[in-house]
Every structure is written in structure tokens, then in C-alpha cells.
């Protein structure tokens, strides 16, 4: 249960941020919030302006690429999630020569929260290296059903899509 004058922060990749307060609250300090009062609780929601961020992707080869974000990309968001849709064995991400994230391919997009690297990414970008996936990989049986990979040319390494997903936030103070 929240105390009066408690500060609350909510985060979401959706532009409509929602929270439920129990017991019901009489007011919150932010005027942009909508409150739907129920008998025992309150539904609180904020609507944020959507942000679209297009990363610049430079391909060095099918296995190596670099991502840069536009100036001010981190403004008005809580975080930016880089979503990398690829097929391969493993992926590694580097900033200034230091590995900051890695991933074993599992059939879903690789997601990396970028906020903690914001300054370095804005200055130098982030570098990615993908390794080929071969037919004898022991974990192929664990990949999602229906995922069919073409090993007729040997290893598979394919970058399908890169997108930036903004994470929004709202901070408010409640009172009973």
C-alpha cells in the first residue's frame, strides 16, 4: 500500500501508461493523468506522444554491422530497446572495443536496453558481430517448432531487421 505523497514511476513500451492504486486515491499531482475511480481502487493512465527513432545501420559484411542513433534519441524516453531480428549461432555487441551484450540464437529477437550506454552510443555507435549457425549445432532441437533453416550452403547467418523500441515513463505523486 502506498503512503500519501508517495512518488510512483511507471514504464512501458506502450504510449498509454497504466497503473492501479489500492486503496482508491482522491488526487494525484500531475494534471495530464486520467483517474478512473472504482469503489476500492483507482485506475490511473497517462498518454504519451509516440516517438519514432530510425537507427542508422552500416553493414560491413553479412556478419558485421554498426548501429548509430540520431542526436537526441534518448530525449523524452525512459530507455531505448534495440531489437535485432537475426538468424545465426551467437551475436556479440561492442562499444569502444568492450563487449557489452551477447546472445545465443533462440528464434526470437535479441533485445538490448541502451540507456546505460547512451553517451558512448551517441559518440561512437555500437558494433555487432554475428556467428554462423551450422546444421550440427546441438541446440537446434530447442528452437521453436516450425522454424525451418536452410543449411544447403553451409552455415546460416542473416540479419533480418533492426528496430528501436522506445520505453516511456510517467512519474506522479498520489494522495488519499
Language model features: what each stretch is:
Residues 1-176:
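Non-catalytic C-terminal accessory domains or segments of carbohydrate-active enzymes
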Amino acid at each position: 500500500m502506498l503512503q500519501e505523497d508517495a512518488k510512483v514511476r511507471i514504464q512501458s513500451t506502450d504510449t498509454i501508461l497504466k497503473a492501479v492504486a489500492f486503496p482508491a486515491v482522491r488526487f494525484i499531482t500531475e494534471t495530464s493523468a486520467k483517474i478512473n475511480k472504482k469503489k476500492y481502487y483507482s485506475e490511473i493512465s497517462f498518454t504519451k506522444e509516440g516517438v519514432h527513432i530510425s537507427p542508422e545501420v552500416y553493414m560491413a559484411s553479412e556478419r558485421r554491422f554498426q548501429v548509430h542513433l540520431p542526436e537526441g534519441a534518448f530525449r523524452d524516453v525512459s530507455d531505448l530497446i534495440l531489437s535485432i531480428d537475426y538468424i545465426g549461432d551467437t551475436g556479440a555487441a561492442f562499444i569502444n572495443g568492450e563487449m557489452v551484450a551477447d546472445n545465443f540464437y533462440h528464434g526470437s529477437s535479441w533485445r538490448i536496453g541502451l540507456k546505460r550506454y547512451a553517451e558512448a552510443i551517441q559518440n561512437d555507435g555500437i558494433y555487432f558481430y554475428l556467428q554462423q549457425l551450422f546444421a550440427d549445432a546441438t541446440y537446434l532441437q530447442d528452437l521453436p517448432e516450425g522454424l525451418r533453416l536452410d543449411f544447403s550452403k553451409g552455415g546460416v547467418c542473416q540479419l533480418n531487421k533492426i528496430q528501436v523500441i522506445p520505453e516511456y515513463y510517467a512519474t506522479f505523486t498520489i494522495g488519499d
